[in-house]
Amino acid sequence: TTPDDHFNTFVVYAGVTRDVAPAVYLQLPESYTSNQVLIKLLDKALEGLPNQPTFTEMMQNGITLGQLRQLLKTKEIVDVLEKIGIDTGALGQLIKVIDKLPAVGDNLRIAVGVPNRAGAYSVTAITDNKNYNVGVGVGALVLKADKAKLVWKQDIGKKISAANAKTADFAAELQMNGTAVSDQSSVHVLYSGLTSKWKVYSSTTTPPTEPGRYVMTAVVLGGNYQAAPITRSFQITK
């Protein structure tokens, strides 16, 4: 190769997030995503095809493997790519790489871009240049969860009246550098204890309001953040 050689690189990230959910990402070359002329040509070629999103919609919402296969079989699309010097052979190799992933079917949704969720991924890079054979390289990527901190949203003290318990905010929230993170879906709270009538109380959704003694624990399960659990005990009085 020479310093003047230009290669487009497609990257496939496939793996499992911290939520144990499968995830596949396709990173397109900048020559695709920043070329407004190319995007308009591809959008126009795709507009007339049934059940096929435009290229702009694919970049925003992702694409299923079935749609990607159909895309590469469409003559109008292949013609557009070849006219501007894009090696469609590399795109065929891209399909082969994705086909080798476990449990792959046409309904597999592929996100366009790079992984944005903590997890472990295999990485396959595919380069293209019409003057060279298609190159394929394989590696691995681990995205670690950001370290955050769990805090109680309201200090209820050691004792709280039954009347105040009905309006108190028992929730916990994740914070980074003192600011609540936007996604709180991984925060879970367990309430347990005994009412004053010796009735066992346990819930993961509803805080207690009857007089008694209770313990509550907040934990983070999955998601893009990790934080140590927090626990507090309190008494609800009449």
What are the residue ranges of the model-derived segments?
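Solvent-exposed beta-strand/loop surfaces, strongest in extracytoplasmic domains of secreted
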Residues: 1-238
